[in-house]
């Protein structure tokens, strides 16, 4: 079984709606698809889930989450994405990520970035563009929306 861990940064936008920071995979396979996902990647060596998620987020966005206390990350559980892969996710309130300042490492083939575009999206938009098995992660964060609206 393959394991991946990822981070879902979120914020409350000017319309008072929760938005999630997601990426569009790079490469020929994805260039014509309107698919967006949390930034995630494989667990290496003896890493714990959160360490993997933080490392992968930085590799795929160039944005460091090192300033955040590990207790600030919200465990969102895991899903079986397919018969060979389990995905674990964490949320973090992180409203100051700027899409245009993000860039990704280069994928295994050396030709394309792992992530070629970044966006903040509301759940209503994202639910049509992401992996259906990942929706539970975003739904768990939406349950906390009022708590963050009050602290905006």
Which sequence ranges carry the predicted segments?
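Intrinsic low-complexity, intrinsically disordered segments enriched in polar/basic residues
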Residues: 1, 109-112, 146-152
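N-terminal strand-loop-strand
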Residues: 1-38, 90
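A generic secondary-structure boundary signal that marks alpha-helix termini
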Residues: 16, 62-63, 150
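Unchanged
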Residues: 36, 41-136
């Amino acid at each position: 079984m393959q394991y991946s861990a990822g981070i879902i940064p979120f914020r409350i936008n000017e319309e008072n709606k929760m938005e999630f920071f997601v990426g569009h995979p790079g490469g020929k396979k994805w260039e014509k698809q309107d698919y967006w996902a949390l930034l995630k990647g494989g667990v290496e060596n003896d890493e714990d889930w959160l360490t993997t998620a933080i490392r992968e987020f930085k590799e795929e966005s160039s944005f460091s989450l090192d300033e955040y206390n590990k207790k600030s990350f919200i465990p969102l559980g895991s899903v079986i994405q397919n018969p060979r892969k389990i995905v674990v996710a964490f949320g973090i309130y992180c409203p100051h990520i700027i899409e245009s300042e993000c860039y990704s490492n280069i994928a295994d083939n050396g030709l394309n970035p792992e992530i070629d575009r970044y966006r903040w999206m509301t759940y209503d938009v994202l639910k049509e563009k992401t992996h259906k098995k990942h929706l539970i992660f975003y739904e768990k964060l939406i349950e906390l929306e009022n708590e963050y609206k009050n602290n905006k």
